[in-house]
Amino acid sequence: MKKVWINGCFDVLHHGHFKLIQYATGFGGNLFIGIDSDKRVKQLKGEGRPFHTALQRKYNLECILGVRQVFIFDTEEQLRGILETIKPDVFVIGSDYIDKPIIGAEFAKEIKFFDRIGGFSTTGLLDE
């Protein structure tokens, strides 16, 4: 079975996250997910974030059918180390990363881009 990788904050799961997971699982049977640590989410998203702790986010994702394993990473080096160990067949990432450096891409056999679903973002939901 193919190993498929996605990563992100996944702070408050919404429709866009589920579409990403559905898209990624279409490439193979084993979906591995990396999530940013609480410290990293706060650095990326600002004060008041994350809404859910890393352990809560990990648990929520592990409850989704098709998710094989969820990893929490605190640094880019840790993310690279996880990807080097897993060596995914497919690395799925948002299409906003086309022509941008992708951390750990060198460990994947193939990169697939996912077009984000307009109007769905955790930040947008929390700001409402």
Give names to the regions the model predicted.
Residues 1-128:
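Nucleotidyltransferase catalytic core that binds NTPs
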